[in-house]
């Protein structure tokens, strides 16, 4: 069912900023091609308390932003609905959002979005539907008629579940999605306020350790390697600060290369802005950190959104992407 523009704008504003080997050496910044410094040197960046925000913290701690002439302040977003007002009034420059959220914002007209860098792509084990061990639900088909907790409606969780349930002949309107914050989902399951919950890491591992079991991995099959989230700014901001945007992209690219090759680098920073301990970061399931920005990959998200009625019309993701300098 396709929702109206006003409703979709509200959904976009409240959408969740989601979601997520050893020893690679950083090759350093690319030589040449830089004329003048960044137009704006002090940036406020909105991050979510999930592993996919790690590259910004890596870039900051390793001095990559400093080398690009940038000083970065991070703001952990606990209430997703506060993000777009900050972006639109200029108190936040760049933010991380799920691609479902970013495409929704673009389609709703709430803002024109430019994607600066990919953040995380899906991998098996990082998100899925869980039930308590004693639940009568034994497989995805059993979710028909179930009440499922999600962190946000019309976002990554509901869309990825819809793609999987379709294969089991369960339509989205045959389940009931209810909003429960990730932190409260396990309690909702234990108290039987919901039948199942869609969780992401690190909540997924914690729930399984506390007596829940995985019923459906939502990062396989139709959503295998699906792009999850990325760093974005408004079209207006990017047009006014092209050198700043490019500097941010270069710094994050270097951090992404470290994140994809060395789990220990991630373990250094994730505990700084989440409640996940270092040893858990070393062992938990993790998505992949793309080192390129590919519109074709992200288009998969927009196409799934259109298929399941999240969009009024198809969105061309290529028009939203800002090529990474040097690529």
Which role does the model predict for each range below?
Residues 1-11:
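Bacterial N-terminal signal peptides that target proteins for export
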Residues 18-21:
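C-terminal motif of bacterial Sec signal peptides marking the signal peptidase cleavage site
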Residues 23-26:
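Bacterial signal peptide processing site
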Residues 28-170, 179, 195-198, 214-217, ...:
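Short, glycine-/small- and polar/acidic-enriched structural segments
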Residues 67, 121-122, 220-224, 288-296, ...:
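Short, solvent-exposed loop/beta-turn-alpha elements that line the ligand-binding surface or hinge
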Residues 100, 109, 178, 183-269:
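Pocket-lining segment of extracytoplasmic ligand-binding domains
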Residues 238-312:
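Secondary-structure end/capping motifs
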Residues 305-327:
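Conserved C-terminal helix/tail region of periplasmic/extracytoplasmic solute-binding proteins
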């Amino acid at each position: 069912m396709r929702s109206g523009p006003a409703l979709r704008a509200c959904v976009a504003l409240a959408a969740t900023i989601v979601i997520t080997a050893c020893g690679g050496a950083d090759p350093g910044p690319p030589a040449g091609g830089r004329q003048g410094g960044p137009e704006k040197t002090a940036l406020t960046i909105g991050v979510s308390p999930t592993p996919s925000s790690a590259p910004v913290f890596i870039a900051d701690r390793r001095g990559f932003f400093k080398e690009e002439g940038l000083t970065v302040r991070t703001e952990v977003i606990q209430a997703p609905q506060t993000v777009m007002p900050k972006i639109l009034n200029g108190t936040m420059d760049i933010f991380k959002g799920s691609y479902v959220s970013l495409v929704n914002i673009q389609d709703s007209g709430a803002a024109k979005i430019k994607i600066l860098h990919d953040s995380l792509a899906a991998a098996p084990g990082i998100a899925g539907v869980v039930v308590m061990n004693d639940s009568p639900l034994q497989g995805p088909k059993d979710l028909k008629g179930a009440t499922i907790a999600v962190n946000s409606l019309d976002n990554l969780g509901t869309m990825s579940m819809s793609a999987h349930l379709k294969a089991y002949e369960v339509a989205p309107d045959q389940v009931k999605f209810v909003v429960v914050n990730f932190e409260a989902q396990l309690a909702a399951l234990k108290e039987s306020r919901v039948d199942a919950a869609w969780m992401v890491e690190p909540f997924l591992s914690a729930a399984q350790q506390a007596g829940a079991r995985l019923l459906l991995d939502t990062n396989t099959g139709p959503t295998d390697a699906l792009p999850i989230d990325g760093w974005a700014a408004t079209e207006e901001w990017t047009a006014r600060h092209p050198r700043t945007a490019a500097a941010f992209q270069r710094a994050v690219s270097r951090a992404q290369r470290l994140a994809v090759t060395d789990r220990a680098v991630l373990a250094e920073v994730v505990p700084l802005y989440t409640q996940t301990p270092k040893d858990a970061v070393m062992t938990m399931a993790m998505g992949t950190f793309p080192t390129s920005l590919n519109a074709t990959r992200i288009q998969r998200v927009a196409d799934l959104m259109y298929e399941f009625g999240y969009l009024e019309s198809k969105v061309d993701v290529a028009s939203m992407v800002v090529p990474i300098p040097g690529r």
